[in-house]
């Protein structure tokens, strides 16, 4: 059979199931190439070591020349995590053990913090550190005895004196967690204790202090309801007066403590034990407006939209209420003397609290009037090219004395206009006399020669198109 080369390199992935042969070289030079192995597990020797390795082969696997490297390994090549075992050759048992993972220490810290026993955790951590340092010091003092310790473990010898007996005599609780009797179960914190789910029992935690189980049912006040000693639907036996966090007990029990929601809880009776039947409302016990966590309502509260009051299923007694669809003063059935929703009407005027009568706002083209507006005040029209002196009438100027008055317009030049003023601006209708007067005005104008040439041209030239009315000789 072919020898497995990966086994000689100590990286065969198949182990005992490999189809090639796993043999240990007689010289021991290539079988184990890695020295000073710090490993986090305390595993047993491999199966091939227990079956095939002889005492004569140990001298080849563990030559004396490697003993001098132990001091260097423990001094210079020591890993950062202190709670780690040490072996001079890979795949062989550790010379000394003391492996504790960071997860284990973290779990112990959580346990200590939960039971308020951090002092025991710190003491246990110090003991573990002292134990590992004592074992390392024993190996450095006698490396030859450390190799004999490994040989005895490999051959399965048990009746030998360990070199770590003196170093570990001052640390008698190495296998114990926190001064607790050592147990064989991997879950030793639960082996000799009571069931965690028993009622009214106390369980001993891993720190030795009796604590209450997280799942134990104690006779304490529940944060959500009251502890009752009878069926909540019968109402025959009295209940305890432990206040509930929500202010009301379950299904009709009387409460006397304050509610966590601010409502005033008073002794009420529900439909379960009050002698009343189940209400006939089609909305059952949830048809009332009042919530089980709110205060008692009175007649002045808003009316229910579902009609008459029914008994609450949560012990809240409601006062008689009226339906919103009956003869109520709602927004849909306002009386005749009520005020409109969007302000006062046009028939009435609001009263000024200062004692003055408020005039309604001016309409379109109507001038403001009031106690602060003097009479015969001139206002400018924002739409016309001319302005006029407007009297009380906003549509005409009937006073003959106001004619032929030139006033300053708002948007441009103005002309003197006799007669009534157009209320929507200057007159856009021109009479025949106005057109004749406009045509006669062009006869008196002196056109420049270049403009005369534009009118005399046979074709339109861009930039030289006349933009005014032609003179009379071209008409």
From Swiss-Prot:
Q: Kindly state one GO CC term assigned in the UniProt record.
A: nucleus
Which InterPro entries does its entry note? Nucleoporin_NUP42, Znf_CCCH
The Gene Ontology biological process annotation of the record reads: cell division
Instruction: Kindly indicate whether the keyword Transmembrane belongs to this entry.
Output: no
> What is this protein for, i.e. what is its function?
Involved in the cell polarity process where it is required for the correct termination of microtubule growth at the cell ends during interphase.
Name the PANTHER family for this protein.
NUCLEOPORIN NUP42, NUCLEOPORIN-LIKE PROTEIN 2
- Record-given protein name: Nucleoporin-like protein amo1
Species of origin reads Schizosaccharomyces pombe (strain 972 / ATCC 24843)
Q: Highest lineage ranks of the organism?
A: Eukaryota, Fungi, Dikarya, Ascomycota, Taphrinomycotina
């Amino acid at each position: 059979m072919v020898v497995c080369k990966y086994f000689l390199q100590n990286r065969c992935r198949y182990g005992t199931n490999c189809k090639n042969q796993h043999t240990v070289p007689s010289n021991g030079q290539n079988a184990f190439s890695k020295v000073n192995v710090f490993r986090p597990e305390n595993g047993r020797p491999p199966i091939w070591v227990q079956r095939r390795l002889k005492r004569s082969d140990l001298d080849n696997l563990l030559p004396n020349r490697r003993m001098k490297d132990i001091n260097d390994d423990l001094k210079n090549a020591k890993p950062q995590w202190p709670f780690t075992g040490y072996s001079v050759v890979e795949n062989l048992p550790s010379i000394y053990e003391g492996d504790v993972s960071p997860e284990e220490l973290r779990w112990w810290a959580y346990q200590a913090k939960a039971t308020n026993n951090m002092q025991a955790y710190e003491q246990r951590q110090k003991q573990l550190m002292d134990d590992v340092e004592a074992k390392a010091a024993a190996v450095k003092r006698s490396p030859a005895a450390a190799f004999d310790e490994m040989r005895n473990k490999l051959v399965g010898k048990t009746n030998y004196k360990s070199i770590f007996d003196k170093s570990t005599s001052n640390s008698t609780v190495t296998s114990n967690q926190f001064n607790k009797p050592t147990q064989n179960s991997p879950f030793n914190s639960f082996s000799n204790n009571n069931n965690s789910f028993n009622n009214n029992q106390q369980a001993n935690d891993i720190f030795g202090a009796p604590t209450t189980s997280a799942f134990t049912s104690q006779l304490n006040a529940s944060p959500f309801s009251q502890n009752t000693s009878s069926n909540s639907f019968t109402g025959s036996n009295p209940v305890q007066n432990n206040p509930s966090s929500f202010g009301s007990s379950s299904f009709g029990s009387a409460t006397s403590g304050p509610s966590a929601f601010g409502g005033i809880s008073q002794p009420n009776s529900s439909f379960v034990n009050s002698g009343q039947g189940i209400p006939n409302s089609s909305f059952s016990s949830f048809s009332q407006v009042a919530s089980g966590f709110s205060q008692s309502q009175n007649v002045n509260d808003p009316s229910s939209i579902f009609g008459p009051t029914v008994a609450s299923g949560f012990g809240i007694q409601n006062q008689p209420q009226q339906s919103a669809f009956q003869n109520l003063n709602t927004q849909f059935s306002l009386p005749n003397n009520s005020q409109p929703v969007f302000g006062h009407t046009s028939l009435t005027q609001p009263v000024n609290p200062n004692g003055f009568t408020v005039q309604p706002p001016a309409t379109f083209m109507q001038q403001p009037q009031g106690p602060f507006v003097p009479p015969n005040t001139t206002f400018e029209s924002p739409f016309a090219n001319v302005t006029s002196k407007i009297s009380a009438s906003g549509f005409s100027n009937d006073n003959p004395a106001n004619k032929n008055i030139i006033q300053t317009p708002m948007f441009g030049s103005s002309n003197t206009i006799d007669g009534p003023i157009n209320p929507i601006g200057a007159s856009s209708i021109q009479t025949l006399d106005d057109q004749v007067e406009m045509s006669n005005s062009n006869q008196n104008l002196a056109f420049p020669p270049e403009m005369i040439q534009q009118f005399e041209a046979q074709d339109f030239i861009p930039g030289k198109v006349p933009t005014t009315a032609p003179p009379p000789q071209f008409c």
